[in-house]
UniProtKB/Swiss-Prot annotation:
Localization (cell): Cell membrane
Ranges facing Cytoplasmic side: 52-59, 126-144, 223-242, 301-320
Protein family per UniProt: Belongs to the G-protein coupled receptor 1 family.
Membrane-protein topology: Multi-pass membrane protein
Entry superkingdom: Eukaryota
Main location group: membrane
Ranges that cross the membrane: 31-51, 60-80, 105-125, 145-165, 202-222, 243-263, 280-300
InterPro entries xrefs: GPCR_Rhodpsn_7TM, Olfact_rcpt, OR51/52/56-like
Chain positions carrying an annotated carbohydrate: 8
PROSITE patterns: G_PROTEIN_RECEP_F1_2
Coiled coil residues, start to end: none
Keyword annotations: Cell membrane, G-protein coupled receptor, Glycoprotein, Membrane, Olfaction, Receptor, Sensory transduction, Transducer, Transmembrane, Transmembrane helix
Gene from which the chain derives: OR52W1
Name of the protein in question: Olfactory receptor 52W1
Length: 320
């Protein structure tokens, strides 16, 4: 009883938060480890193997494959930023997270999400250059160019996401220590704040629209250029070959943005009509499903990656 009263009090900079997982599910949420456990394992194995294969095989040291390795590293970081804590909450029940650790997790989740969106845009630009300007492609897109792009995307992600935890940290009073979520999501923490959170909410909304909106516009523009270039090709075989080089990337884009769109819409417009466990489920699917699917998509649809993985895991030697 005393503990319940304490959790419902107002706290001045709490030392920790308590993550409860899926509100209302109780012990039944333990079964969700059978879903998220394999998803995380798949993300670990796939996103660990893909950069290793690109690193080992010098023939894959090309812009397209280097971007794949960067995407895999980002996916690995994103999945690892939430999955261990998620599985701990599902299996062991509510757990405490130090206040500072919660803010750090908030930063990494949003920064890596922004980074992934930026990498998908860079990959779309790479394909547009390869298909639209094939003769100039080796000059336009180099390994150094990919390195600078990755650095710029990382700096952009850090710069725009740093205000998230800083804005939360400036609040002094919280109405509770209990977060009804599986990780320290920005809005889940802000809901506990006692005070005016309008500036924080507006920044979060503007940031979501700016990152996703600008990247989606860039991706759409890149594929518009690709479509225009493909239509200029003389044969259907050439059309199919050009489309084949983009099909994996299109699948990855859909796997990233569609769950994100559903998660965003249910949170912003279905807050009072969609059950909270559904919000949390969509949020976790949005962050964990793409890292699990991306290596499968590229491993299955990109011949060079597929062949190199088969050679690695079956101990076959590539032909001379």
């Amino acid at each position: 009883m005393a503990e319940t009263l304490q959790l419902n009090s107002t706290f001045l900079h709490p030392n920790f938060f308590i993550l409860t997982g899926f509100p209302g599910l109780g012990s039944a949420q333990t079964w969700l480890t059978l879903v998220f456990g394999p998803i995380y394992l798949l993300a670990l194995l796939g996103n660990g193997a893909l950069p290793a294969v690109v690193w080992i095989d010098s023939t894959l040291h090309q812009p397209m494959f280097l971007l794949l390795a960067i995407l895999a590293a980002t996916d690995l970081g994103l999945a690892t930023s939430i999955a261990p804590g998620l599985l701990a909450v599902l299996w062991l029940g509510p757990r405490s997270v130090p206040y500072a650790v919660c803010l750090v997790q908030m930063f990494f989740v949003h920064a890596l999400t922004a980074m992934e969106s930026g990498v998908l845009l860079a990959m779309a630009c790479d394909r547009a250059a390869a298909i639209g300007r094939p003769l100039h492609y080796p000059v336009l897109v180099t390994k150094a160019c990919v390195g600078y792009a990755a650095l710029a995307l990382a700096l952009k992600a850090v710069a725009i996401v740093v205000p998230f935890p800083l804005l939360v940290a400036k609040f002094e009073h919280f109405q509770a220590k209990t977060i009804g979520h599986t990780y320290c999501a920005h809005m889940a923490v802000v809901e506990l704040v006692v005070g005016n959170t309008q500036a924080t909410n507006l920044y979060g909304l503007a940031l979501s629209l700016a990152i996703s909106g600008m990247d989606i516009l860039g991706i759409t523009g890149s594929y518009g250029l690709i479509a225009h270039a493909v239509l200029q090709l003389p044969t259907r075989e050439a059309h199919a070959k050009a489309f084949g080089t983009c099909s994996s990337h299109i699948c990855v884009i859909l796997a990233f943005y569609i769950p994100g769109l559903f998660s965003y819409l249910t949170h912003r417009f279905g807050h009072h009509t969609v059950p909270k466990p559904v919000h949390i489920l969509l949020s976790n699917i949005y962050l964990l499903l793409p890292p699990a699917l991306n290596p499968l998509i590229y491993g299955a649809r990109t011949k060079q990656i597929r062949d190199r993985l088969l050679e690695t895991f079956t101990f076959r030697k590539s032909p001379l």
